[in-house]
């Protein structure tokens, strides 16, 4: 305020100058789509998104990033990384046993929008799911 930065919390995660990401020489970032899920969702939208073959997908689920069963069936084990996130605005999305079976990553504490940016950056470094998941735990 008034030209002075006020800090109230210190970040415990990697960021800015500690980051492994460098976008200076990139002309474009990978295409990562956000799909917002809701109860009673029909198959048309998730099928359409998967058919576009994005570089990555963020599934914005309910509470703990919970997604409808039909969306899970459509989006599991795709050729691109898929990350579960929550639409609640805060809280953690942690891995559950079904994630490993579906090939999903989790956003940890990141919002869907921040998870999208991190996945875009992560895909400039690797397509390895374990390494991508580690980025979500570090940043």
Sequence positions of predicted segments:
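Accessory alpha-helical/coil subdomains and C-terminal extensions
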Residues: 1-65
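C-terminal non-catalytic interaction/assembly regions of soluble proteins
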Residues: 56, 61-139
């Amino acid at each position: 305020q008034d030209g002075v930065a006020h800090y109230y919390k210190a970040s415990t995660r990697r960021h800015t100058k500690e980051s492994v990401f460098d976008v200076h020489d990139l002309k474009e970032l990978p295409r990562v789509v956000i799909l917002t899920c809701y109860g009673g969702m029909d198959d048309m939208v998730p099928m359409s998104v998967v058919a576009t073959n994005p570089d990555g997908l963020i599934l914005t689920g309910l509470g703990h990033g919970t997604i409808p069963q039909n969306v899970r069936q459509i989006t599991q084990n795709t050729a691109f990384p898929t990350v579960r996130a929550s639409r609640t605005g805060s809280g953690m999305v942690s891995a559950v046993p079904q994630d490993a079976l579906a090939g999903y990553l989790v956003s940890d504490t990141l919002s869907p929008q921040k998870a999208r940016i991190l996945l875009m950056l992560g895909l400039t470094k690797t397509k390895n799911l374990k390494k991508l998941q580690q980025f979500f735990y570090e940043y």
